[in-house]
Amino acid sequence: MNLQEKTAWITHVARRVIDGDTLSFEEATALLQLPDAVTPFLLGWADVVRKCFHGNRVDLCAIVNARAGRCSEDCRFCTQAACYHTRAPVYPLLPAEGIIRRARAVRSQGIKRFSLVTSGRDPGGDFEKILGITRQLKREVPELKLCASLGIISPTEARALKEAGLDRYHHNLETAASFFPEVCTTHRYEDRVATIRAAQKVGLEVCAGGIIGLGEKPEQRVELALALRELGVTSVPVNILHPVPGTPLATQPPLPALEILRTLAVFRLLLPATTIRYAGGREHNLRDTQVLGLAGGVDALITGDYLTTAGQGTARDRQLIRDLGLEG
């Protein structure tokens, strides 16, 4: 196809999505492999789809790294794995008072969603304390929607979290099933799927996405998006690898900015009614082009700092949103 034919095809595909059709694996892969020259056109149509399904509001959330380091798993991208030598912080579960203080600060900035994140394969011996903190957060900062990211959980633990007042559970698939063994060997992709389904079964919303730029093929990003579509998750955070010394992926070449933006646009077309959330690595990898994601399908973002890397700050995020005529 020539340039004119490519833009006509993008228009046709996007209009189908707006009309309620779903894209196939082959169509999504072809979109992801479009040349840079037509990427702005693809982003424009992804933005139209976002407006049709989500309006102009950008959903903001903030996290607290409530327990850091000493993770038993070997995820090759992760600074918190005990088997790698990084300079990431290591500390036990934070006291409830500190977490409540952080939650109040988040709410004072007008952010309505707050997530408690702990390192490790699972909640372990801190689970009862986490339930208590969740109940306290619900009592003392009732305006916040509460999310938790505690690793692999059982159906019983999912139900206990729901009863304690949790609104949403976060658990990434990380990458496509076909690439997962290259990323982690200490647990299975199926363990992650089981956790997502356990959370959904008790009525928790689920936030689940992954990391791009791990060395996966473009079609494996499509595979990930289709798996998330099949699971019916509410929110899809898209992280972009920020290589850290000491991890096996420390020297992984970065994805080009336009390829990242195409990926976000394709996720929007594959998941039109789902929240697509900017997550870790956007500042490092996209730099000044990150604004194009918000004009190319993204309708949410994690604001403030991430687990072990710094964000650009809520004030700048809000300025980006305002500059685009969006609300957040």
UniProtKB/Swiss-Prot annotation:
<dbReference type="InterPro" id="IPR006638">
    <property type="entry name" value="Elp3/MiaA/NifB-like_rSAM"/>
</dbReference>
<keyword id="KW-0001">2Fe-2S</keyword>
<dbReference type="InterPro" id="IPR007197">
    <property type="entry name" value="rSAM"/>
</dbReference>
<feature type="binding site">
    <location>
        <position position="75"/>
    </location>
    <ligand>
        <name>[4Fe-4S] cluster</name>
    </ligand>
</feature>
<dbReference type="GO" id="GO:0004076">
    <property type="term" value="F:biotin synthase activity"/>
</dbReference>
<keyword id="KW-0808">Transferase</keyword>
<keyword id="KW-0408">Iron</keyword>
<feature type="domain" description="Radical SAM core">
    <location>
        <begin position="53"/>
        <end position="282"/>
    </location>
</feature>
<feature type="binding site">
    <location>
        <position position="115"/>
    </location>
    <ligand>
        <name>[2Fe-2S] cluster</name>
    </ligand>
</feature>
<dbReference type="InterPro" id="IPR024177">
    <property type="entry name" value="Biotin_synthase"/>
</dbReference>
<feature type="binding site">
    <location>
        <position position="71"/>
    </location>
    <ligand>
        <name>[4Fe-4S] cluster</name>
    </ligand>
</feature>
<feature type="binding site">
    <location>
        <position position="147"/>
    </location>
    <ligand>
        <name>[2Fe-2S] cluster</name>
    </ligand>
</feature>
<dbReference type="InterPro" id="IPR010722">
    <property type="entry name" value="BATS_dom"/>
</dbReference>
<dbReference type="InterPro" id="IPR013785">
    <property type="entry name" value="Aldolase_TIM"/>
</dbReference>
<dbReference type="Pfam" id="PF04055">
    <property type="entry name" value="Radical_SAM"/>
</dbReference>
<feature type="binding site">
    <location>
        <position position="78"/>
    </location>
    <ligand>
        <name>[4Fe-4S] cluster</name>
    </ligand>
</feature>
<dbReference type="GO" id="GO:0051537">
    <property type="term" value="F:2 iron, 2 sulfur cluster binding"/>
</dbReference>
<dbReference type="GO" id="GO:0051539">
    <property type="term" value="F:4 iron, 4 sulfur cluster binding"/>
</dbReference>
<feature type="binding site">
    <location>
        <position position="207"/>
    </location>
    <ligand>
        <name>[2Fe-2S] cluster</name>
    </ligand>
</feature>
<keyword id="KW-0411">Iron-sulfur</keyword>
<keyword id="KW-0004">4Fe-4S</keyword>
<dbReference type="Pfam" id="PF06968">
    <property type="entry name" value="BATS"/>
</dbReference>
<comment type="function">
    <text>Catalyzes the conversion of dethiobiotin (DTB) to biotin by the insertion of a sulfur atom into dethiobiotin via a radical-based mechanism.</text>
</comment>
<dbReference type="GO" id="GO:0005506">
    <property type="term" value="F:iron ion binding"/>
</dbReference>
<feature type="binding site">
    <location>
        <position position="277"/>
    </location>
    <ligand>
        <name>[2Fe-2S] cluster</name>
    </ligand>
</feature>
<keyword id="KW-0093">Biotin biosynthesis</keyword>
<keyword id="KW-0949">S-adenosyl-L-methionine</keyword>
<keyword id="KW-0479">Metal-binding</keyword>
<dbReference type="InterPro" id="IPR002684">
    <property type="entry name" value="Biotin_synth/BioAB"/>
</dbReference>
<comment type="similarity">
    <text>Belongs to the radical SAM superfamily. Biotin synthase family.</text>
</comment>
<comment type="subunit">
    <text>Homodimer.</text>
</comment>
<protein>
    <recommendedName>
        <fullName>Biotin synthase</fullName>
        <ecNumber>2.8.1.6</ecNumber>
    </recommendedName>
</protein>
<dbReference type="GO" id="GO:0009102">
    <property type="term" value="P:biotin biosynthetic process"/>
</dbReference>
<comment type="pathway">
    <text>Cofactor biosynthesis; biotin biosynthesis; biotin from 7,8-diaminononanoate: step 2/2.</text>
</comment>
